[in-house]
UniProtKB/Swiss-Prot annotation:
HAMAP family (UniProt xref): 23SrRNA_methyltr_H
One GO MF term attached to the UniProt entry: rRNA (pseudouridine-N3-)-methyltransferase activity
Key words, A-Z: Cytoplasm, Methyltransferase, rRNA processing, S-adenosyl-L-methionine, Transferase
Binding site for S-adenosyl-L-methionine: 108, 127-132
Catalytic activity: pseudouridine(1915) in 23S rRNA + S-adenosyl-L-methionine = N(3)-methylpseudouridine(1915) in 23S rRNA + S-adenosyl-L-homocysteine + H(+)
Designated name of the protein: Ribosomal RNA large subunit methyltransferase H
Gene label: rlmH
């Protein structure tokens, strides 16, 4: 299985890079992982709604340029489905069974995802109604993907 994470924003913090490296190493037993890091657009402090929309659309075009036709796209979105780790594991497993072996997770920038990216998504997923820094969220996502594979294989980790 191929897992791709497309994320807007550069990872700067060393501790987050170390966590990403650790989960990337752990996931290498289960899948081929690719992380695509895209630059985020600078948002002015007092940006208007129109300016924010333009920024999301610009980031969205960049995201869409990285998505291939054969990718099963999961958009990380506050309006998405909230599911348990077990159901997440089953979802990933079912993707493989249905022939969707190229799963792509999309993490937007600080303003979220454009409507075009949301429309392209095959599934919308929400980890929480709380807001997280998108750099930290990348670590959280990889941990949940790792947990999902461990659950799938009935290996100890998840409690």
């Amino acid at each position: 299985m191929n897992i791709t994470v497309i994320s807007v924003g550069k990872l700067k913090e060393k501790y987050l890079k170390q966590a990403i490296d650790e989960y990337s190493k752990r996931l290498s037993r289960y899948c081929k992982l690719e992380i695509i890091e895209l630059p985020d657009e600078k948002t002015p402090d007092n940006a208007s709604e129109k300016e924010e929309l333009q920024i999301k659309e610009k980031e969205g075009k960049l995201i869409l340029s990285k998505i291939k036709d054969n990718m099963h796209v999961i958009a990380m979105d506050l309006k998405g489905n909230e599911i348990t780790s077990e159901k997440f594991s089953k979802y990933i497993e079912n993707c493989g069974v249905m022939g969707n072996s190229n799963i792509t997770f999309v993490i937007g920038g600080s303003l979220g995802l454009s409507q075009e990216v949301i429309k392209r998504a095959d599934y919308k997923l929400c980890f929480s109604k709380m807001t997280f820094p998108h750099q930290l969220f990348r670590v959280m996502l990889l941990e949940q993907v790792y947990r999902a594979f461990r659950i799938m294989k009935n290996e100890p980790y998840h409690k």
